[in-house]
Structure formats: C-alpha cells, structure tokens
Amino acid sequence: MLIFPAIDLKGGRCVRLYQGRMEDAIVYNDDPVSQALAWQAKGAQMIHLVDLDGAFEGEPKNLPVIQAILEAVTVAVQLGGGIRDLNIIDRYLRMGVSRVIIGTAAIKNPELLSVACKEYGQRIVLGLDARDGKVATDGWAGTSQVTALELALEMKGRGLRRVVYTDISKDGTLAGPNLAATAELARATGLKVIASGGFATIDDVKAAAALEGDGIEGAILGKSIYTGAIDVAEAIRVAREGRPC
C-alpha cells in the first residue's frame, strides 16, 4: 500500500482544515516547497497536493506554488482542486503532475471525465468526497443527491480506474478513518481506492494496509503527519508490509 503525504494549499501556504471548513484552516508551513521536499526526504513516492482555493472557486488559484513544487521534487505528484475542464487537466499534466483528481466536475459535467479517461487513462482519478454517504461538491460546500457508490459505478463505466475516497466527517478530526465504507466501495466497484480522512495513529495505517486485498491501494495522511501523531517514514514502512498473511 502506498502512503500519500498531503499538502493542502490556501493562499500559497500549507494548511489543514477541519471537516473541510475553510474558516477553520490552520497554517502548518508558509513554504509548501520545503514541506514537499521534507515529505520526499521521508521516503514518500507520491505527494497528494490540493488547491483548496481552486476547489472553492472552481479554477486554479495556486499555480506558482504548484509549479515550484513540481520543479523542486523528484517524486510523483497527484493534484486536485478546481479542475473543471480539459484545458486545466492538460495544463497540469504538461506541467509535470502525474495524476489529476476530478471531483465536482464528475457530478456537474460527467462527460468531462469520459473524455479525460479516454485521453489520459489512469492519470485521471475521481475525487469522491462523501457526507453521510452522499457526494459533496464545490470544495465540500455543497452536497448532491448522488451516493458515492452510484457515482463510482457510473464513472467506472466511463473508463475510470481509481478513486480517492474521503469521508468528510472524518477529515482533519484525527478520529480514525472510515475504512469499512472505503473497503466496501472498493469491493462493490472493483476500482482501486485510496483512503482519505481521519488517519490518527500508525494502527490506522496498519488497518488500511490489511485491506489492500479488498482494493485499498493507498492512504492519504494529512493532519496526523503535521501534528506528529504519525511519522511518515514509519507509515511508509508499515504500508509496504501490506496485509498480514
């Protein structure tokens, strides 16, 4: 299982939110480039980057910082937030992003995901953010009537192969991830699923790794690695051990 250290960008700085609320943002580093290099030094193979301003405003808002991170690190970067059209997808991939995450646009313009998957294959990821089982949109400010499973299955039919699944109620809480729902989504769809939200201890990482056989291929770590609750290097080691025999 792969560990993804997260860097959420707001106003060019590295922040963490609580349950997706921008007003609760806490700044952890004024220099996201140095933060990305720090996670790379810890052994990360891929960094999870989110343009929070872009997610709320519907267009890229932290391009200079994103470009600087891409130029500084040698590891892969997956990026989400404000990716609503093919031109933005193409721009990010040309900049050096390894994977782009499409969230709100999958609900509002599902044909975009179809075209993107056909054009870019597995470099396209669905960002599936759920609140009480329903898909949230617009930087989590809105909630649709579509369930996470319904959207995942529809997007699979459009060529999707990978999902980042976030239980919003867990995000930034250090309350433990919703691995039951994450594993069920993976089993029900056959998609590769990256778990996100609520990771608090190394035991949470172990529990996720134990479900690798169910389709959980990665875990995104945010607040826990900024508070020191989880050490990135240890999480990577534990994740590599995979599920127990």
Curated annotation (Swiss-Prot):
Catalysed transformations (reactions): 1-(5-phospho-beta-D-ribosyl)-5-[(5-phospho-beta-D-ribosylamino)methylideneamino]imidazole-4-carboxamide = 5-[(5-phospho-1-deoxy-D-ribulos-1-ylimino)methylamino]-1-(5-phospho-beta-D-ribosyl)imidazole-4-carboxamide
Active site: D8 (proton acceptor), D129 (proton donor)
Known pathway: Amino-acid biosynthesis; L-histidine biosynthesis; L-histidine from 5-phospho-alpha-D-ribose 1-diphosphate: step 4/9
Top-rank lineage group of the source organism: Bacteria
EC number: 5.3.1.16
SUPFAM superfamilies: Ribulose-phoshate binding barrel (SSF51366)
Record's keyword terms, sorted: Amino-acid biosynthesis, Cytoplasm, Histidine biosynthesis, Isomerase
InterPro entries linked to this entry: Aldolase_TIM, His_biosynth, HisA_bact_arch, Isoase_HisA-like, Isoase_HisA-like_bact, RibuloseP-bd_barrel
Gene3D superfamilies named in the record: Aldolase class I (3.20.20.70)
EC category name: isomerase
GO biological process, one term: L-tryptophan biosynthetic process
Pfam families, per the entry: His_biosynth
GO cellular component: cytoplasm
UniProt-annotated location(s): Cytoplasm
Entry similarity comment: Belongs to the HisA/HisF family.
Protein name, per record: 1-(5-phosphoribosyl)-5-[(5-phosphoribosylamino)methylideneamino] imidazole-4-carboxamide isomerase
Organism of derivation: Heliobacterium modesticaldum (strain ATCC 51547 / Ice1)
